[in-house]
């Protein structure tokens, strides 16, 4: 199998602390770059765990359409600003950050006081502007999760009247782009490919770590396929037809034929279906006349039995 390597050729950190990494992966066989690019992109964009603000509580506010005395932004603006805060929690438990700021002041994400388990990535993110003589007291709830989680207003755990819920976007990767370049032709004339991948994160995770996590998830996904064990499918016994379940008595056979069959442990049509014409003649005291009688009775209900064992 062709050995390839991955090189990070570019790494940038923007003013909002988002990070961009550009990677070159190769050389690859034809078609492998598309396979890698699509697989990594899907996992990077939708399956990595991240942290998001899920709810906000503001002192004196019990609905999102309110205004706060002395605060320039209305509650909806504050909720939107809080939603855009980038945080990184190292615990799966709910974490709460709190702040109390007296004006005049511009309240920023760095003013939030969390436990040591939570890091505020973009501390300069503005939350609100408080005028002189006024103050703002609020708390934000942050959680870890995957993907997107809409507000659940019917959840009793989060339905407190003063707890303003937010649609949570846990995805730490904002954008993934990739292109495929052909490299020099190898010995034997087989062309090679190189995958160029750009990964942009929110800053709570580096592009390098994002690539590594995505790769590990794909390994875990495919690993069971390497140890597939074949299990023979047990064929189900065919369900007996309605005709096969007809009892021997309903064939209206002669007393002689009926008694001979009963002594041979034949109790229903399904038992007869295991016989050929030759088998019937071998039943004790069962002559050709009785055998013909059975054949005619079976034909009346649409069932035929073979003449000999070899034709069965």
Swiss-Prot record:
- What name does this protein carry? DNA-directed RNA polymerase subunit alpha
As for family, the record states: Belongs to the RNA polymerase alpha chain family.
E.C. designation(s): 2.7.7.6
Reaction catalyzed: RNA(n) + a ribonucleoside 5'-triphosphate = RNA(n+1) + diphosphate
Q: Show the domain comment.
A: The N-terminal domain is essential for RNAP assembly and basal transcription, whereas the C-terminal domain is involved in interaction with transcriptional regulators and with upstream promoter elements.
Report the InterPro entries cross-referenced here: DNA-dir_RNA_pol_insert, DNA-dir_RNA_pol_RpoA/D/Rpb3, DNA-dir_RpoA, RBP11-like, RNAP_asu_C, RNApol_insert_sf
Entry GO MF terms: DNA binding; DNA-directed RNA polymerase activity; protein dimerization activity
Q: Name one Pfam family in it.
A: RNA_pol_A_bac
Q: What biological process terms from GO does the record include?
A: DNA-templated transcription
Instruction: Describe the task this protein carries out.
Output: DNA-dependent RNA polymerase catalyzes the transcription of DNA into RNA using the four ribonucleoside triphosphates as substrates.
SUPFAM superfamilies hit by this protein: C-terminal domain of RNA polymerase alpha subunit, Insert subdomain of RNA polymerase alpha subunit, RBP11-like subunits of RNA polymerase
Source organism, top-level taxon: Bacteria
> What are the boundaries of the region Alpha C-terminal domain (alpha-CTD)?
239-312
Keywords from UniProt, A to Z, are: DNA-directed RNA polymerase, Nucleotidyltransferase, Transcription, Transferase
Quote the subunit structure annotation.
Answer: In cyanobacteria the RNAP catalytic core is composed of 2 alpha, 1 beta, 1 beta', 1 gamma and 1 omega subunit. When a sigma factor is associated with the core the holoenzyme is formed, which can initiate transcription.
Q: Where is this region: Alpha N-terminal domain (alpha-NTD)?
A: 1-229
UniProt keyword annotation of Transcription present: yes
Cite a GO CC annotation. cytoplasm
Q: Does the keyword Transferase apply?
A: yes
Species, as recorded: Synechococcus sp. (strain WH7803)
């Amino acid at each position: 199998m062709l050995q390839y390597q991955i090189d990070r050729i570019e790494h940038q950190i923007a003013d909002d602390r988002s990070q961009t990494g550009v990677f070159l992966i190769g050389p690859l066989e034809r078609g492998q770059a598309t396979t890698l690019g699509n697989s990594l992109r899907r996992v990077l964009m939708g399956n990595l765990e991240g942290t998001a603000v899920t709810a906000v509580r503001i002192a004196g506010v019990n609905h999102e359409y309110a205004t706060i005395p002395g605060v320039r932004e209305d509650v909806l603006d504050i909720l939107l600003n809080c939603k855009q805060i980038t945080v990184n929690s190292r615990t799966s438990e709910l974490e709460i950050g709190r702040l109390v700021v007296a004006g005049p002041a511009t309240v920023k994400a760095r003013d939030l006081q969390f436990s040591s388990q939570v890091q505020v990535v973009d501390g300069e993110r503005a939350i609100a502007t408080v005028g002189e003589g006024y103050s703002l007291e609020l708390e934000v709830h942050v959680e870890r999760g995957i993907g997107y989680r809409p507000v659940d207003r019917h959840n009793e755990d989060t339905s407190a009247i003063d707890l303003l819920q937010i649609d949570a976007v846990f995805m730490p990767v904002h954008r993934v782009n990739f292109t495929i370049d052909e490299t020099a032709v190898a010995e034997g004339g087989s062309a090679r490919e190189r995958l160029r991948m750009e990964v942009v994160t929110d800053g709570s995770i580096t592009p390098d770590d994002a690539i590594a996590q995505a790769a590990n998830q794909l390994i875990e996904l495919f690993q069971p396929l390497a140890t597939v064990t074949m299990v023979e499918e047990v064929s189900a016994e065919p369900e007996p037809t309605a005709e096969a379940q007809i009892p021997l008595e309903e064939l209206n056979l002669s007393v002689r034929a009926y008694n001979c069959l009963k002594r041979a442990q034949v109790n229903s049509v399904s038992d007869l279906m295991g016989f050929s014409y030759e088998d019937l003649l071998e039943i004790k005291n069962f002559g050709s006349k009785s055998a013909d009688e059975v054949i005619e009775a079976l034909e009346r209900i649409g069932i035929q039995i073979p003449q000999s064992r070899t034709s069965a």
